[in-house]
Amino acid sequence: MIFVYALLALVITFVLVPVLIPTLKRMKFGQSIREEGPQSHMKKTGTPTMGGLTFLLSIVITSLVAIIFVEQANPIILLLFVTIGFGLIGFIDDYIIVVKKNNQGLTSKQKFLAQIGIAIIFFVLSNVFHLVNFSTSIHIPFTNVAIPLSFAYVIFIVFLQVGFSNAVNLTDGLDGLATGLSIIGFTMYAIMSFVLGETAIGIFCIIMLFALLGFLPYNINPAKVFMGDTGSLALGGIFATISIMLNQELSLIFIGLVFVIETLSVMLQVASFKLTGKRIFKMSPIHHHFELIGWSEWKVVTVFWAVGLISGLIGLWIGVH
């Protein structure tokens, strides 16, 4: 059945994207490009966004099919809730952006409050209503040591889900970058899940992986469609949730290393400018810095994918030991 889920997720996305693109163009749901960004990006103005709707719909449909046949499908139900929750926040943000024809959307406060709400509901559904059971301790790799957090684990979950949701969002600035890194990440978590005996989570990772594979051909340079916040916020939230449900939170640092680096580059840039009036990078997130020093967009993407693959394998090794 795993092959069926994979094929279904792949086909649905691959078929939906070319159907959605003309609809988005007709509705003028095109991406606005930052004027201060690399000049090479200006030609992307008007490229349809909100393409994440295609793979999210594929994930929802395929997951509902899987829930019927998979024993102990509660993990899939919970992951589906997170997918829809974070995806809905991204959809609202995208909708406001394309209607107003600017790069604003939801305010930071509105977005954070909504993300925090989804994270808290996730914790309540899992640990209060016991849809799934996972430890409220952080396990240290290669040891039998676990750091109990008790109630503070709620804060940790919120930090991880909200932080990683926005990390993937920041990374989604080059054609295919976030999509490719997510494919690598879900591949690692799929293998990890099956090795750890978490079959339902593994199946969901397979669904994620193949839904994104169906989207990638339309998203690589030159992109015919962008996933938008609809896709990126959902992907980040799912990554964090999977690491939490596997009790392998620290593996996320490596499996999502490029996302972490991208986020840190923004934080360092802002802090440096506020404290010294000088910028560390030519532009942040850091993928734009490499563009501005002369790298082609495709070179940045492939190098970042390679880094993601190597760090992902390290994260996988950590997770299964």
Curated annotation (Swiss-Prot):
**What topology does the record note for this protein and the membrane?**
Multi-pass membrane protein
Keywords associated with the record: Cell cycle, Cell division, Cell membrane, Cell shape, Cell wall biogenesis/degradation, Magnesium, Membrane, Metal-binding, Peptidoglycan synthesis, Transferase, Transmembrane, Transmembrane helix
Q: Does the keyword Cell cycle apply?
A: yes
What does the record list as coiled-coil region(s)?
none
Check the record and name the PROSITE patterns matching this protein: MRAY_1, MRAY_2
Reaction equation(s) it catalyzes: UDP-N-acetyl-alpha-D-muramoyl-L-alanyl-gamma-D-glutamyl-L-lysyl-D-alanyl-D-alanine + di-trans,octa-cis-undecaprenyl phosphate = Mur2Ac(oyl-L-Ala-gamma-D-Glu-L-Lys-D-Ala-D-Ala)-di-trans,octa-cis-undecaprenyl diphosphate + UMP
**What EC number(s) does its UniProt record assign?**
2.7.8.13
**Quick one: a GO cellular component term?**
plasma membrane
The regions listed as transmembrane in this protein's record are 1-21, 50-70, 76-96, 112-132, 140-160, 176-196, 200-220, 225-245, 250-270, 300-320
Named in its record, the pathway it takes part in is: Cell wall biogenesis; peptidoglycan biosynthesis
Major site of localization recorded for this protein: membrane
InterPro entries assigned to the protein according to its UniProt record, in alphabetical order = Glycosyl_transferase_4, PNAcMuramoyl-5peptid_Trfase, PNAcMuramoyl-5peptid_Trfase_CS
The molecular function terms of the Gene Ontology recorded here are: metal ion binding; phospho-N-acetylmuramoyl-pentapeptide-transferase activity
The keyword Transcription regulation belongs to this UniProt entry's keyword annotation: no
Give the signal peptide, or none: none
Q: Which GO terms describe its biological process?
A: cell division; cell wall organization; peptidoglycan biosynthetic process; regulation of cell shape
Short name of any one Pfam family annotated for the protein: Glycos_transf_4
Q: Which cofactor does it need?
A: Mg(2+)
* Entry's localization field: Cell membrane
* EC top class, as a word: transferase
Family affiliation:
Belongs to the glycosyltransferase 4 family. MraY subfamily.
User: Mind telling me which PANTHER family this protein's record contains?
Assistant: PHOSPHO-N-ACETYLMURAMOYL-PENTAPEPTIDE-TRANSFERASE (PTHR22926), PHOSPHO-N-ACETYLMURAMOYL-PENTAPEPTIDE-TRANSFERASE HOMOLOG (PTHR22926:SF5)
Say what the protein does. Answer: Catalyzes the initial step of the lipid cycle reactions in the biosynthesis of the cell wall peptidoglycan: transfers peptidoglycan precursor phospho-MurNAc-pentapeptide from UDP-MurNAc-pentapeptide onto the lipid carrier undecaprenyl phosphate, yielding undecaprenyl-pyrophosphoryl-MurNAc-pentapeptide, known as lipid I.
HAMAP family with a match to the protein in the record: MraY (MF_00038)
Protein name, entry field: Phospho-N-acetylmuramoyl-pentapeptide-transferase
Species, as recorded: Staphylococcus aureus (strain bovine RF122 / ET3-1)
- The gene it comes from is mraY
